[in-house]
Design a protein with these regions (language model features):
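...captures the hydrophobic TM-helix bundle architecture rather than a specific catalytic motif
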Residues: 1-237
Length: 237
C-alpha cells in the first residue's frame, strides 16, 4: 500500500514485473525435451539440449542480476523480506527431502524385495564403497566444514577467511564433480541395465547435479564477495 506522497509505508518488497519466471519455465521445458530426445537418439536433439542449457544459464544470470540489484543497490531486502526468503528456503529444502525420499524408496523397494532373490543382481559389477565413493563422501563432509568456516568468518567480519573458505569449498565441489564423472566413465553398467543401474544413476546423478548447481551458486557468492558485497550484519540476498 502506498500513501499519497509516493512513499511505501510497509517493509514488503513489491516485485516489478519480470520475464524470468516464464523464461525459466520455457528453459526447463526445452532442457527436459532435449534430454528426452537425446536419450531416444532423435535428430538434432543435441542442439535442443544445448539450447536448453544455454537458456537456463542465461535465465540464472539475469535473474540473479536483478536480485543482487534489489538487495545491494535498491535496498528492497528489508528484515521482513529476509524472513520470507528464509521460509522459502526451508520449504525448498523440505521439497528436496521428499524428492530424494522417492529415489531411496525406489532403491529399498527393489533391494529389500528383489525379483531375482538376490541384491544386487548377480550380473552387475558394483563399485567398492570404500574406494571413490568414500573419497567423495569425505570431500562432501570437508566442503561442509569449509563453507561453515567461511560463514562464521563473515559473521565476524573476517573477509580474508570468508573468501578463502568459499574458494576452498568451490575447489572441493569441482573435485567431487570430477571424481564422480571419472566414476561414471569407468562404471561396468549403464543407465538401462536393470533396476539397480537405474536407481543408482538416478539418485547419484541428481545428487551430482545439486553439487554442480551449488558450486555455481558459491562461485557467484565468491565473485560478489570479491567486489565488496555481503556484510557481517547483512549477508542474505
Amino acid at each position: 500500500v502506498y500513501i499519497m506522497s509516493g512513499k511505501q509505508n510497509h517493509q514488503y518488497h513489491l516485485v516489478e514485473p519480470s520475464p524470468w519466471p516464464a523464461v525459466g519455465s520455457a528453459s526447463g521445458f526445452t532442457l527436459v525435451l532435449g534430454a528426452a530426445m537425446y536419450m531416444h537418439e532423435y535428430p538434432y536433439s543435441a542442439f535442443i539440449l544445448i539450447a536448453g542449457f544455454l537458456m537456463l544459464f542465461a535465465t540464472m544470470f539475469f535473474w540473479w542480476r536483478d536480485v543482487v540489484r534489489e538487495a545491494e543497490y535498491q535496498g528492497h531486502h528489508s528484515p521482513i523480506v529476509q524472513i520470507g526468503m528464509r521460509y522459502g528456503m526451508m520449504l525448498f529444502i523440505a521439497s528436496e527431502v521428499m524428492f530424494f525420499v522417492a529415489f531411496f524408496w525406489a532403491f529399498f523397494d527393489a533391494s529389500l524385495y528383489p525379483d531375482t532373490g538376490v541384491w544386487p543382481p548377480e550380473d552387475v559389477q558394483v563399485f567398492d564403497p570404500f574406494d571413490l565413493p568414500l573419497i567423495n563422501t569425505m570431500i562432501l563432509l570437508l566442503s561442509g566444514c569449509t563453507v561453515t568456516w567461511s560463514h562464521h568468518a563473515l559473521q565476524h567480519d573476517n573477509r580474508k577467511d570468508f573468501l578463502l573458505g568459499l574458494f576452498l569449498t568451490i575447489l572441493l565441489g569441482i573435485s567431487f564433480t570430477a571424481l564422480q564423472a571419472y566414476e561414471y566413465s569407468h562404471a561396468a553398467f549403464g543407465f538401462t541395465d536393470g533396476i539397480y543401474a537405474s536407481t543408482f544413476y538416478m539418485a547419484t546423478g541428481f545428487h551430482g547435479a545439486h553439487v554442480i548447481i551449488g558450486t555455481i551458486f558459491l562461485i557467484v557468492c565468491l565473485i560478489r564477495g570479491c567486489v565488496g558485497h555481503f556484510k557481517a550484519e547483512k549477508h542474505l540476498g
